């Protein structure tokens, strides 16, 4: 399954960058049905793998080069935390070209209150920012995503 994910999700970056894709213990889909407190232990376990992989990359492979951070779905959640805990306010922040994080909503409050140095991307030429999006099937009502209402 990991090979399929790399082929379908990481291949577009092969022409412009070296791809470093960590293997990590992912939570199961049923974990999302648990209450927030019950989700924490499995999410923390998965994130610990992601954090260890990023630190290994930063120490052994980055060598001062610019990088993109890419995550999808569950990886988007881990990448948000990684941006906050291991990139923002560190020398790696200056090397971040952009973070591409599709597949999960990111509340405006996250940028306003937590990730204050890495804003949402607003234009294609912007760097040091976070691009995120959702795709929707026909008949969906994306305007109902609460995180992007004006009062959030």
Could you tell me what each predicted segment is?
Residues 28-32, 77-78, 109:
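Short catalytic/ligand-binding loop motif for oxyanion handling, primarily in non-cytosolic enzymes
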Residues 23-27, 72-73, 101-105, 136:
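Active-site-proximal beta-strand/loop segments in catalytic clefts of secreted hydrolases
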Residues 18-23, 68, 97-100, 131:
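Hydrophobic/aromatic beta-strand patches that form the interior of the parallel beta-sheet core
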Residues 32-36, 81, 106:
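Short amphipathic alpha-helical patches
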Residues 52-63, 84-152:
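Surface cap/lid and interfacial helix-loop subdomains adjacent to catalytic sites
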Residues 1-66:
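Active-site catalytic motif of lipid deacylating hydrolases and related acyltransferases
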Residues 71-79:
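Gly/Ala-rich beta-loop-alpha elbow adjacent to hydrolase catalytic centers
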């Amino acid at each position: 399954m990991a090979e399929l994910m790399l082929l379908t999700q990481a291949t577009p970056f092969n022409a412009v960058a070296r791809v470093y894709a960590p293997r990590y213990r992912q939570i199961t889909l049923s974990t999302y049905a648990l209450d927030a407190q019950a989700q924490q232990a499995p999410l923390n376990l998965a994130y610990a793998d992601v954090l260890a992989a990023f630190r290994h990359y930063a120490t052994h492979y980055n060598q001062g080069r610019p990088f993109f951070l890419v995550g999808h779905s569950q990886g988007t959640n881990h990448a948000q935390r990684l941006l906050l805990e291991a990139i923002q306010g560190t020398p790696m922040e200056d090397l971040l070209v952009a973070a591409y994080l599709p597949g999960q909503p990111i509340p405006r409050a996250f940028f306003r209150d937590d990730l204050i140095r890495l804003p949402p991307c607003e234009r294609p030429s912007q760097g040091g920012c976070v691009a995120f999006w959702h795709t929707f099937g026909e008949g969906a009502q994306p305007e109902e995503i609460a995180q992007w209402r004006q009062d959030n």
